[in-house]
């Protein structure tokens, strides 16, 4: 170790050539906002010199490109990219994301602590620096059937793992505020460590209590007033822009040079097609600047503020002593990424090098019996029916009341009101199924089914035809998970996700290409949502207001109860 320190000192002082020099860069100083012409000297995986000229064993000519610190995605689920961590690395690192904070919550709900074992090992095999936060709420609630239950003692063996960054999104904010013993046990176990939050619309004294419990960050903030209250109370708000949850437009006015130390970026859930077409964190930076955010504020939020929020003091700036995570840009305003250096290595070379790939667990995880069309019958009730109201671009849903047609004692879909059926079928070995209605998909025919169903990942199907709903679900079971579009008694498009019913074992390019016909098939049913499959996937999430559905029934999230 002392030899390595001596090497860094010698190279930083210019007495020895640096391992790598990025020559003729324009460094965006995140302290002052200045653009400074300089070389950047790198020794091993660390920066040893800036603000001057250096000689190097290897030289990369920046040719006047702007150098910014590598981007940090502060909260994501790799599983939601539908690909393995190794493919996620190939897909996302070229977009400038050199650090990702992964909550393997989706895998954990299916596999239990085996998800942590896999995530921590896979993170050692990626070029991108992936840090794992341990899932805090498995299951999210007791209002659904999950594949696993993880209490405080099960978390203890992983707490001090060098790849573990702390406790991931604490979804059970009502439990924390009420002093639930199970919640308190987890918080006590991680006292002094980073604990990530999940507190949509929480405010006032309840928010005070939540923050006082040690919660430091939150990514479920959807409005500027909510965000301002949270940062004033000491939280860092992680501005989210994923494939479904899109909060950046609403929160961008709050992101200024003054507030940027208290705001960062995250994607949460973003699929390979959106990454290919729009980008990753580079897309968020581009969008923020396009909405009027000062470039200094945007790039600071994407790196330095994120590093500070999560205690990653070794990164977030291009400065001596920091990790050599560097992004070269052709253009600052559009965040046009030209080249990425990750831990001192050019990303394109590191990604091409042979690497170990730990096999992913979770095959054979869909343990559900086939269903018949009659299973989707919903008994008619007098008066109005509770219907889930989908809000495009949001995972918050509305609790709507509609009068639906009926025949022979059964409630029917009403296409004139855009009301179709939705069902959740348990898939972890125990029986369970619930049916209801949803408004906002625009379906005129057929069905869309998914084995991705946050957070317990039971099977979820939305459809205007019971026979097609049964066909789509049964095809999911045969595939051992995935996405299916069915119409007129035939499967129109599908993508198998055999790893825990959540991830593909294919290269990201193949998954990206498979999403095109799936979206087209969904549009062919009349679907008006830009990302129908992830929208389906959030219908069973009973921690996000206001009305959801699980395998046990419709859930009034505001009262945390199953509707009769």
From Swiss-Prot:
> What is a GO molecular function of this protein?
adenine deaminase activity
Q: Which UniProt keywords apply?
A: Hydrolase, Manganese
SUPFAM superfamilies per UniProt: Composite domain of metallo-dependent hydrolases, Metallo-dependent hydrolases
Q: Which InterPro entries match?
A: Adenine_deam, Adenine_deam_C, Amidohydro-rel, Metal-dep_hydrolase_composite, Metal_Hydrolase
Q: Which cofactor does it need?
A: Mn(2+)
Q: Which GO terms of type biological process are on file?
A: adenine catabolic process
PANTHER family referenced in this protein's UniProt entry, alphabetically? ADENINE DEAMINASE, N-ACETYLGLUCOSAMINE-6-PHOSPHATE DEACETYLASE
Q: What name appears for this protein in its UniProt entry?
A: Adenine deaminase
